Each structure stands twice: as structure tokens, then as C-alpha cells.
Amino acid sequence: MPKIEVKDGDLELALRKFKRVASETKRSFLKHEYHLRKGVKRREKEKAARKRLQKKHRMY
């Protein structure tokens, strides 16, 4: 369980930090839930990069 210290009674900031750390922990766990071969990992990384670029270049 991630821990965050509350400084000067700033609970809202501490809560945001906690949520960020907790989501990273969950994401990391899901990423390492099972072993991926090197090539499969590379293809997934390339797919995520393409998706990220398409999202960046969308016109609203």
C-alpha cells in the first residue's frame, strides 16, 4: 500500500498524490502479471506509440 505524508494540513494535495501513486502501482502490477516475450513486448510498445501519436494529431 503506497503511503503519502500530509504536510501543513494540505489534504487535497496529498489525496491527489496518493491516487497517482496508487494507479501507478496497479498499472505496474498488471504490466508484470505474466511474462511477455521480447518481440511481443516490442510490438505492444509500438502499438501504444502509434495510438498515442494518433491521439496527439486528432483535430477537434
From Swiss-Prot:
What Pfam families does this protein map onto? Ribosomal_S21
Matching InterPro entries, A to Z?
Ribosomal_bS21
- Coiled-coil annotation reads none
One GO cellular-component annotation of the UniProt record comes to: ribosome
As given in the record, the signal peptide range reads: none
One GO term under biological process is:
translation
Keyword Glycoprotein belongs to the record: no
The highest taxon in the source lineage is Bacteria
Q: Name one GO molecular function term.
A: structural constituent of ribosome
**Region (Disordered) spans which residues?**
38-60
Say yes or no: keyword Ribosomal protein present. yes
Q: Which UniProt keywords apply?
A: Ribonucleoprotein, Ribosomal protein
Q: Tell me the HAMAP family matching this sequence.
A: Ribosomal_bS21 (MF_00358)
Annotated family: Belongs to the bacterial ribosomal protein bS21 family.
What's the protein called, per UniProt? Small ribosomal subunit protein bS21
Identify the species of origin.
Mycoplasmoides gallisepticum (strain R(low / passage 15 / clone 2))
Organism phylogeny: Bacteria, Bacillati, Mycoplasmatota, Mycoplasmoidales, Mycoplasmoidaceae
